[in-house]
Amino acid sequence: MNTSVSFPATSRRSVARHPVWTVSVLVAAAVLAGCADMSGITPQARLRDPASVGLVATAPSAVAAPTVSTEWWHAMGDAQLDALVAQALQNNPSLKVAQARLARAQAVTEVADAALLPQINGAVDLTRQRYTETGAVPAPLAGSIRSTGTLQLNASWELDFFGKYRAALDAALGTVNAAEADAQAARVLLASNVARSYIKLARTEAQLVVARRTLAQREETLGLVRDRVSAGLDSQLEQHQSEGGLPEARQQIEALQEQSQLTRNALGALVGDPKVALVLSAPALAAIKNMDLPPAIPADLLGRRADIAAARWRVEAAGKDVVNAKTQFYPNINLVAFAGLSSIGLNRLIGSDSLQWGVGPALRLPIFEGGRLRANLRGKTADLDAAVESYNASVLDAVHDVADQVASARSITRQQTEQQAAQKSAESAYGIAVQRYKAGLGNYLNVLTAETNVLVQRRQAVDLAARALDVQVGLARAVGGGYTAAALPVQQVAGE
């Protein structure tokens, strides 16, 4: 139930003679506002302090400044990759969804902003009617048929004494800022997904080179074995063993070609053009350059990650929603006015005698709402707690993400050093085994063993090179992909 206290329209001179009306409205509003019961409804969640996750205390100050360009993929030195990312940023549907959400949030902000301003509308009413002879209508109107007309402007302005509409506007602005950060996060994620898929394709193509080289070596070895069998130096066992390696190598090539096509299809979907799979040149893994990235977790990580910025702005918006829910307990104070022309008989509508106008305040206060206002406040407070915990989870996930990428980057560097030494030994052993077999000093089992070892190392070299690049892309994304928040809300929970 809503109780409203309305004041009759009167003239400007009458209002001037009774300034006590305005004072009475404000006093009544203050007294009635004191009856608002919001006890026991407070936010429970708290924002995690950056120092509690080690961002300030352990990170070196040397990496506090942004080190990743907003177009970080250019540092990889691949023109085809640059073109793919540019096409994806222009055509990808997921990115357009994020941009549409931003446009919607901006429209909501305009609606909230309009609520702070006076509202004016016009009305035109033209009616032809017969007046009853058995009602309260006096003669000569009773029983007659007349035309009535009204031309009127109505104005109203709700005075935002308790900040209801300001809180709604601030909440909408927070949502806009969150949507802007979401759009940037989508951009960073899309670019990293394109780069990672491109590296995956380069890895597959490099593995194809290894597989084809292996097939050629096995064909060469099979020719040698057949010559030795013809000369009576080896048996059919060695020949069958050598022949068995060819189908296995061809099967591996076919599997890698399938993987290559699937990756090309994925790239086509990411860039929004399936035809890309048909015209894309095979990327060379060795031609993709390494990037210069932070060696540790940046101290200002919270300002670099668009997803964290979006989560923080959602906390701010939820806090303002709580403020708005609290203002629902307070009175609404409106100033209303109208002016226009009204007459019975259209021939007299336009004239000074038909002029009517009025102005006055109106006070409305919720007295009994069946618990609706408290339930609404509890819901908005729960939304705030959820937004805070979502932000805290985003912070922890971000720190975990960067820490994993940094640890992997360091480990892969050490692994590559060891793998290169292992491959050098395996290549030498394979060459010696083949030479000894040709000279009749070794058996075919030694050749098979050496070939297996060198094949493992060649594949491992490709995998580590691809993984090193993939981790670099992951690290570029994890530290924000070049995003820097212009400003974040103060580190507190709004709405308290």
Which ranges hold each PLM region?
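Transmembrane beta-barrel architecture of outer-membrane proteins
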Residues: 81-83, 148-150, 196, 241, ...
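Small/polar, glycine/serine/threonine/aspartate-rich low-complexity segments that form flexible
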Residues: 67-76, 126-154, 277-294, 323, ...
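Periplasmic alpha-helical coiled-coil/stalk elements that build and connect Gram-negative outer-membrane
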Residues: 165, 181-297, 408, 412, ...
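Short flexible linkers and secondary-structure junctions
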Residues: 36-193, 333-337, 367-377
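Sec/SRP-type N-terminal targeting helices
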Residues: 96-97, 113, 159-187, 237, ...
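Terminal intrinsically disordered/low-complexity segments used for targeting and assembly
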Residues: 2-7, 19-90, 149, 173, ...
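A short glycine-centered flexible hinge/capping loop motif at secondary-structure junctions
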Residues: 229-233, 437-441, 478-480
